[in-house]
């Protein structure tokens, strides 16, 4: 039983690390979206925009594929900052598993556009 408890603690610690990396990477992604739009479209268009509007602009400019998915990441980021309970942590963890592919896709689109 003690071994199982240690494994559970290690798994929870691993998930917490994944969530922390998600939070950091999510922040970088939206900031790069904003910077790309400021540089390539207009700096005025992104002044004071909400994340919803930023993701809409990013989708319109083909930086991201799925607007709704990015709104889900935004929700997960917000909830991970303000709440900690195991059910919400598990939900955020599951969302981060989808986020990895979306973040990689976004990076690829940025790289193609910046050559």
Residue ranges and their predicted role:
Residues 1-115:
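Solvent-exposed interaction patches of small proteins and small membrane subunits
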